[in-house]
Amino acid sequence: MDLTNSKLSSFNFKEKRVLLRVDFNIPIRDEEVLNDERMIRALPTIKYLLEKAKSLRIITHRGRPLESGEVQPEFSVKPIAKRLSQLLDIPVPIADSLDGLEQDKKIIMLENIRFFQGEKEKVKYKATQFNTLCVV
């Protein structure tokens, strides 16, 4: 898919850190992705942003973990990051905290956004936190 004529191409991503929220809530069994169709459909956008932006931060959720604010391994996005690494042929590290998104890496995936308190409460709350981390 060529994104040259898409709305994305109207933005100047050069030297900008971009935050991309994707729906990678996909079936996983025994730490293996069973269906990567959603990931494959997102690849053109991800590749475009990797090419144009300074860096890319990806957030997604997986399942409905308890609202304890604690990591629950059965809802981790690590298998998703592993599969995305294979699809992109580059490492996709996981950030276990918002501070981890500030690492100097081309691409980082945040651990399951639903592990973070406030995720379900108000979009504005999270948007404010991410505003300081990413420009777009």
Feature-to-residue mapping (PLM):
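Active-site loop-to-helix "anion-binding N-cap" substructures in soluble metabolic enzymes
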Residues: 1-136
